[in-house]
Amino acid sequence: MPDFPPKPSVKADIAIIGGSGLYDPGVLENAKEYKIYTPYGEPSDYIIVGELGGKRVAFLPRHGRGHRIPPHKINYRANIWALKMLGVKWVIAVSAVGSLREDYKPGDIVVPDQFIDMTKSRVYTFFDEGIVAHVSMADPFCEHLRQEIISTARELGYRVHPRGTYICIEGPRFSTRAESRVWREVFKADIIGMTLVPEVNLACEAQLCYATIALVTDYDVWAERPVTAEEVARVMKENTEKAKKILYKLIPRLPPEPDKARCSCCSSLETALL
């Protein structure tokens, strides 16, 4: 078993995991940086802890500031473990994704309810030595948190899709045209990205309420239409501002503790351990 470092003295109720384009939350007051050590190594970056709407909030840029860590090299276990050490109950992940559907347009927000894992070489569990756990992933996202995100995005007037299947590929390369057509036509996935897995299953093992704000930047290559870097950069900038506004409005309304009547995230291990 790995050595367990002492728990940090700082605490947080809610965590934001920032994806491509969101390297600084920009909404936290009295923010300070903390270096957190975990038995699985170091997280992607220093964790920023501050306040928003009376809540203690932790922010972690998934790729590190400056986008220096590719998807397949992210230390997902260290990231999730560090948030657990801080006492986090809620995890709001933000991700840039490509669209596999005509009606999921660049600039739209998707709050996925399912995923398909097409990654190949990542570490998927905390339970790989001495203890075996089989967590249920039938409904992989916290439904309570999903509904809060959806209602907040709608209140702000954004185009939001309340359901969607996220297919997670290994990266860092993008799909071929043939692969993209398979994801769309055979697997019936709606959006595509590179970072959801194993983040989502590790959050489940850590008994955290986890949901994703997926921000559509462009159509994947199935669409066979030209996409310029300029256009993607413009949409990503707009999406980042949308994400910040959602977080600013959403976080103050989350209760300190998840409602066990509305979600089972915090008891995911009760039926998982053998």
UniProtKB/Swiss-Prot annotation:
Any single GO BP term: L-methionine salvage from methylthioadenosine
GO cellular component, one term: cytosol
GO MF terms held by the record: S-methyl-5-thioadenosine phosphorylase activity
InterPro entries assigned: MTAP (IPR010044), Nucleoside_phosphorylase_d (IPR000845), Nucleoside_phosphorylase_sf (IPR035994), Purine_phosphorylase-2_CS (IPR018099)
Pathway: Amino-acid biosynthesis; L-methionine biosynthesis via salvage pathway; S-methyl-5-thio-alpha-D-ribose 1-phosphate from S-methyl-5'-thioadenosine (phosphorylase route): step 1/1
Keywords associated with the record: Glycosyltransferase, Purine salvage, Transferase
Highest taxon above the source species: Archaea
Binding sites annotated in the UniProt record for phosphate: 20, 62-63, 95-96, 195
Physiological role: Catalyzes the reversible phosphorylation of S-methyl-5'-thioadenosine (MTA) to adenine and 5-methylthioribose-1-phosphate. Involved in the breakdown of MTA, a major by-product of polyamine biosynthesis. Responsible for the first step in the methionine salvage pathway after MTA has been generated from S-adenosylmethionine. Has broad substrate specificity with 6-aminopurine nucleosides as preferred substrates.
PANTHER family given in the database record: S-METHYL-5'-THIOADENOSINE PHOSPHORYLASE
Entry-linked HAMAP family: MTAP (MF_01963)
Subunit structure, as described in the record: Homohexamer. Dimer of a homotrimer.
Membership in a protein family: Belongs to the PNP/MTAP phosphorylase family. MTAP subfamily.
Protein name as catalogued: S-methyl-5'-thioadenosine phosphorylase
Gene name, Swiss-Prot/TrEMBL: mtnP
